[in-house]
C-alpha cells in the first residue's frame, strides 16, 4: 500500500508504530522521548511513523529532522469542544490519534532544511487551555504537506516559516487565537480547510509570502481579521467563504494579487464590530499595486451609518470588478484613490474618491 494515502481504522502491527518504542496513549504519560526515538530509528532516507488511537501527551516537541518522513495517525477523531459533553471526553483515549502539547512549546517541530515531510490524520491539542503551537515548520522546508489535521485549544495551530511548495489541505483548525501563521516562503497552497480563531488573534496571517494559494476554505468567526496578507505578492484568494463579526475581514498589502469569487459576510451588527479599525477601514482593506478583485460578494450587517465596505486608498492599478454588495445605505461603500478602478459593483455615487 501507498504509505502516503489516508489510513483509517484499527490495526494490529504497522511499521513505525510509536507504541513499540514505549509511547503510551493514556493522556498522562509523556511520550516525547518515545516518539522521537521512533523518528531516530528511521533510515536517513526517511520512512513512516504511526500514531495509533489514544492521547499521546508531550512535555517536549516531537522533532522531525530527516527528509521524507511521513508522520500519521489513523484518524483525527472528534473535532470541536462542542461536539462532546465535557473536556475530559474530548481528551480521553479512543476516537482518534491525538497529540496533546502539555508542556511542549510545539507538538511537532520540523527542523530547518527538511524536505518531503508529510503530517496527516491527527488531532493536535493544547489540552484544556489554549497554549503552545500545534505544528511548527521552523524554516526553509520544501515539499511539505499537512492533510486531515485537527488543531484545537492551542495558541497557534500551524506556524510555517520559509516554506516552499507546501500543501495544507482538508484541515480543521479552530477554537484557538490563531489558526495559521505563514512567514516568508512561496508556493504555499491552503485548500479545503475550515479555520476559526478568537478576537485576540488572526485566523490566517501570511507575511512576505510569494504565490500563496488560498482556495475553497471556510473561515468562521471569531478572529480579529479572517485573512491578513502582509507584504504578499502574486497570491490567489478564490472560492472562500469568509464570515466575521468585525470589519477588516481581508487586510491585504502587496502587489499583483487576485481575489476572485469569494463571499465576505460581516454578520451580527455588533456594537464592537469596528474594534480599533475605524469606520473607514473596510471589511476589505487594500494597500499595494495591481491587485484584482473580481466577482466577489459582500454582505454587510452594519451597526453604524455611512461605513466603508472597501478601502483602497493606497497604491495604483487596483481593480474591483463585477462585485456584489448588498448594503448600499452608506454614501461611501467604496473609499478609493484615483488610481483605483471600480466597475460594475455599485453606482458611482457610492464611490468616494480621496485625493
Task: List PLM regions with ranges.
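Short "repeat-start/strand-capping" segments in structured domains, especially the N-termini
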Residues: 64-67, 115, 140-143, 163-167, ...
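Glycine-rich, low-complexity segments
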Residues: 2-18, 343, 347-355
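Parallel beta-helix/beta-solenoid
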Residues: 70-75, 91-95, 107-154, 169, ...
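Flexible, charged surface loops at secondary-structure boundaries
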Residues: 12, 39-45, 64-65, 112-113, ...
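Short glycine/acidic-rich loop motifs that flank beta-strands on beta-rich extracellular proteins
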Residues: 47, 59-61, 80-84, 101-107, ...
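Acidic Gly/Asp/Thr-rich repetitive segments characteristic of extracellular carbohydrate-active
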Residues: 18-52
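N-terminal extracellular ligand-recognition/capping segment immediately after the signal peptide
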Residues: 36, 43-89, 97-104, 124
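Consensus "Asn ladder" position of solenoid repeat domains
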Residues: 122, 149, 171, 193, ...
